[in-house]
């Protein structure tokens, strides 16, 4: 889905027209968030956001999985598998699954950390535990009450913030902000910008910690692409962030094409991009998530076109403070779970 432009305008007439629906949607969402969830029997860390669309959750999940391994944990990611046909529960295997089976984000993450896809998250807990999970990392699902969360981390894009601050469909918020803030344990601001700082100020005023992070491109890929004209395309929550990252890396982006999030690329679309790249003497470049979705696409089996993925990793500005918060919450969770007192060795 493409975000409507009026979501980022403060007094758009469309938002005013949709306000009654937002009141109803917000009331239902807030009531749902207040419900109790299943205790998974192992600590659950949720990485979510306040709003619809991309904010950097996937690289945050991967960065947190690395941090948890440093703490001696064995994290398993639990995802709804948006865009995949399998309801699950299923353990994602990149050797046999495609994005059409399990979704593009789980497929991409499974190259780095064990991932379980389950349309109903509570049903995926058992499989995650059989995969050796000492901690479950929920990819999204902050507003979903099905599981009790021991640590809720909210991710926002510093450049975008919360748009017009209104609840869907008048704006991008998934629920009214006050009940979401009440259930937030910490905020992670990815990148910089006044919009993100405004959200950070509200979270700080609520007595919650704020962590800063940035996306770090792979230096070897940047070096390989330097000096080459690039035709960039992306079907993610915020394609413009990807294009900005390319340019901020000093790369020569001669053209760009934005698609909706989780867009199922057609052979004709890829062929058209390849033709345009040839005419411009450009290299096709996209995100890791988009390349995961293109995996197995028959046109990619040919020698032409060659599509380069542009990998990024999330770097925390103060990993020590975040590590301390995570370790404290894990210890607290295990105090109420006597059957899971010790972390794996």
From Swiss-Prot:
Protein name (Swiss-Prot/TrEMBL): Tetraacyldisaccharide 4'-kinase
- This chain's source organism reads Bradyrhizobium sp. (strain BTAi1 / ATCC BAA-1182)
Q: Which InterPro entries match?
A: LpxK (IPR003758), P-loop_NTPase (IPR027417)
Q: What is its EC number?
A: 2.7.1.130
Record pathway:
Glycolipid biosynthesis; lipid IV(A) biosynthesis; lipid IV(A) from (3R)-3-hydroxytetradecanoyl-[acyl-carrier-protein] and UDP-N-acetyl-alpha-D-glucosamine: step 6/6
What does the sequence similarity comment in the record state about its family?
Answer: Belongs to the LpxK family.
Where, by residue number, does ATP bind? 51-58
Keywords per UniProt: ATP-binding, Kinase, Lipid A biosynthesis, Lipid biosynthesis, Lipid metabolism, Nucleotide-binding, Transferase
Alphabetically, which GO biological process terms does the record hold?
lipid A biosynthetic process; lipopolysaccharide core region biosynthetic process
Q: Which reaction does it catalyse?
A: a lipid A disaccharide + ATP = a lipid IVA + ADP + H(+)
Function recorded in the entry:
Transfers the gamma-phosphate of ATP to the 4'-position of a tetraacyldisaccharide 1-phosphate intermediate (termed DS-1-P) to form tetraacyldisaccharide 1,4'-bis-phosphate (lipid IVA).
A GO MF annotation of the entry reads: tetraacyldisaccharide 4'-kinase activity
Keyword check for Translocase, yes or no.
no
Pfam families registered for this protein in UniProt:
LpxK
Where are its TM segments located? none
Cellular compartments per GO CC: plasma membrane
* Gene name of the encoded protein: lpxK
């Amino acid at each position: 889905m493409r975000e409507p432009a009026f979501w980022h305008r403060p007094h758009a007439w469309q938002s005013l027209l949709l306000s009654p629906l937002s009141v109803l949607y917000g009331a239902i969402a807030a009531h749902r968030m207040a419900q109790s969830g299943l205790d998974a029997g192992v600590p659950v860390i949720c990485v979510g956001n306040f709003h619809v669309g991309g904010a950097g959750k996937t690289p945050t999940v991967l960065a947190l999985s690395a941090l948890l391994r440093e703490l001696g944990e064995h994290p398993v990611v639990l995802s709804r598998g948006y865009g995949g046909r399998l309801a699950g529960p299923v353990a994602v295997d990149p050797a046999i699954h495609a994005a059409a089976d399990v979704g593009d984000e789980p497929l991409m993450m499974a190259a780095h950390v064990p991932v379980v896809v389950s349309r109903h998250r509570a049903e995926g807990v058992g499989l995650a535990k059989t995969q050796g999970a000492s901690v479950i990392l929920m990819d999204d699902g902050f507003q979903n009450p099905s599981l009790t969360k021991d640590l809720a981390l909210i991710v926002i894009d510093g450049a975008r913030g919360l748009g017009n601050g209104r609840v869907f469909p008048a704006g991008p918020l998934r629920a009214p902000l006050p009940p979401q803030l009440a259930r937030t344990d910490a905020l992670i601001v990815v990148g910089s910008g006044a919009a993100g700082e405004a959200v950070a100020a509200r979270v700080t005023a609520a007595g919650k910690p704020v962590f800063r992070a940035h996306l770090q491109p792979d230096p070897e890929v940047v070096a390989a692409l330097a000096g080459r004209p690039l035709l960039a395309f992306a079907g993610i929550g915020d394609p413009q962030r990807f294009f900005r990252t390319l340019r901020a890396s000093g790369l020569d982006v001669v053209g760009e094409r934005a698609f909706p999030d989780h867009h199922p690329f057609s052979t004709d679309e890829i062929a058209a991009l390849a033709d345009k790249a040839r005419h411009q003497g450009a290299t096709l470049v996209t995100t890791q998530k988009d390349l995961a979705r293109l995996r197995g696409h028959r046109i990619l089996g040919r020698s032409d076109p060659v599509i380069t993925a542009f990998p990024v990793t999330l770097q925390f500005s103060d990993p020590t403070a975040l590590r301390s918060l995570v370790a404290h919450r894990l210890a607290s969770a295990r105090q109420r779970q006597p059957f899971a007192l010790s972390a794996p060795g």
